[in-house]
Amino acid sequence: TCALPIFPINPHDEGAAISGSIALKGARIDDVVLNRYQEEIEPNSPRIVMFSPLETALPYYADFGWVVDQGIEIELPDGETIWSADRDKLIPSQPVKLSWQNGQGLRFEREIAVDENYMFTITDRVINDGTRSLLLYPYGLISRTDEPDTLGFFILHEGPLGVFDGTLQELTYDDLRDNPAETVQSTGGWIGITDKYWLAALIPDQNIPMTGRFYYTNTGSREKFQVDYLLEGKPLAPAGRIEVTNRLFAGAKVVTLLDQYESDFG
């Protein structure tokens, strides 16, 4: 079978902080390599793989989109959606705009930008060329299959965490196993999963009320740990458009960099 088109992140740039790719099928952020860090000290040691697609041994990815209230019949983009892209690569000076039409009067656009370090900015738009009024809720999620090897240090948190209304909340993987679905209300803040050196974090629009969630499922053979948020619904009238901008950090926990992002984005 022929692989579906992908566009690379920072191709041919040995000095870039990250590399990887985004597949037009699903348009998830699911292939991110940290170029400046290696698994071992040896010169030829593999670079750190931050995110991996579903078909790999240890899937770990971020996804964004829209949902509607139960009972509303409308086709929304999902992991099977084949998007069109206006460019063939993603670099800091050049965002990629994706588009898809659902055949029911809605046009979906997603603009993905990346900075010089580890921050993605995802702007999702919906344009209503149809005759129906709708209420769409933006969401973002980070999904990780199976618990990684952790150091188990008492003083070092590894696992799900978030900041909600200014308060830090940390959960262990065992906490999620014991309580598979926990929700938190907040305006602003962020939610993510941390390792000793690496952090994946969703930073939604800081001015919109959100419901953050820590979520766990077990199929018997694989465990899935998920953090996600659902934002307040956005009404979409005929001939109207709605837009939401969210951010994703996927990289090394460099304190000066994290402090700068906190200053920039709240």
Please give the residue ranges for each predicted region:
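Soluble non-transmembrane domains of integral membrane proteins
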Residues: 1-266
